[in-house]
């Protein structure tokens, strides 16, 4: 277990991870963010945007990881909780609750904490998919294997360098649940150092303990995917079979009004600080009113994260975004929305109780956002 984030220290990071993997008392579990699967191939000669989910699992297996979990599982849980929080606020007609801003992008949250403290009060208290997955890994594997949480080592493969800082944030129970963060580029560097080629490894599969994620969970890695997931999940909760796919475009500001059941929701999806500032001025002036605001720092969302392969240009980003939307759609046979995901159903049954429960708030919500 580490309190070191290993910023710009790849050799030390790899050595620490190999030490954890070699310890027979440890169970080391790694999660893969959605944006990683459509970008890591660029480091090994694949075209941008190719979905290499199972090849990436195979690469991690070859590095010594026996248990691989999909970060979109945490996205499923995040959006399930968010949907219930928003529906509850709508039902009690709590206009002061809105607008609510997403918690998923640590880059935007860091910016907000320095430039717009008042806005921080409206950031969702629900932890990011990365952090939720880490919490679930620690608690569920500890329970299933009858091991102390300290011996469950939680590692994440992320498209964003700033996720290393996010790993230090605390949950409502005062704990942190991510031990190591490895960027996409660092994973490729580590593999090459070990003589591994993504093209030559066998495909792997997700851990039998936590095997599934939904279409909407995978879509989080590209701008607009979060809002699509939120609206689709809310619609399914209200028994309105509706998918909000109008956000699958690449403009930097996507504003929509969507009717779901008896509610008319105003939502917007943004990437980039400059675009956020434009929208914020309109919110503060009263020109615009939103129920939910998705903000992603990077162009096209997490697929354009600072931990992704270089060089990068607009065509590469478009290919990654398109590839991730296709990867998300492959999940339809398992689940479109979180509540259809068998793994999510099992976790609420065995660990979390129900959305918004005391246990869910303990394990899935941030204690404080101190950035």
Descriptions of predicted regions:
Residues 5-371:
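Iron-sulfur-associated redox domains of electron-transfer enzymes in respiratory
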